[in-house]
Amino acid sequence: MPRSLKKGPFVDHHLMKKVLEQNEKGTKNVIKTWSRRSMVVPEMIGHTIAVHDGRKHVPVFITEAMIGHKLGEFAPTRTFRSHVKEDRRSRR
């Protein structure tokens, strides 16, 4: 179920503070965050945010199409190792 519109989007305060500081200074440094639950807001457009996937930080460049989505959607947590095709010769 989506979040109520009257509440507005959720963004962790420490992340929003870093984004606003960089907007004031005009810099575009990579921002590291563990906050996968934070929603992408218009102030983040053009920034690169490194989102933690449980093992490393995955750099995500924020575009207009990402507004309203959560940061965790762009950093997959599971790595899929393809199913190995069975070799018929080795079974005999």
Swiss-Prot record:
Gene Ontology molecular function: any one: structural constituent of ribosome
Q: Which domain of life is it from?
A: Bacteria
Q: Which Gene3D superfamilies match?
A: 30s Ribosomal Protein S19, Chain A (3.30.860.10)
InterPro entries xref list = Ribosomal_uS19, Ribosomal_uS19_bac-type, Ribosomal_uS19_CS, Ribosomal_uS19_SF
Q: Which Pfam families match?
A: Ribosomal_S19
What UniProt keywords are attached to this protein's entry? Ribonucleoprotein, Ribosomal protein, RNA-binding, rRNA-binding
What SUPFAM superfamilies is this protein classified in? Ribosomal protein S19
Could you mention a single GO BP entry for this protein?
A: translation
**A single cellular component GO annotation:** small ribosomal subunit
Q: What family does the database annotate?
A: Belongs to the universal ribosomal protein uS19 family.
The record's function comment reads: Protein S19 forms a complex with S13 that binds strongly to the 16S ribosomal RNA.
Task: Please identify the protein, giving its name as recorded.
Answer: Small ribosomal subunit protein uS19
Organism annotation: Thermobifida fusca (strain YX)
Lineage of the source organism? Bacteria, Bacillati, Actinomycetota, Actinomycetes, Streptosporangiales
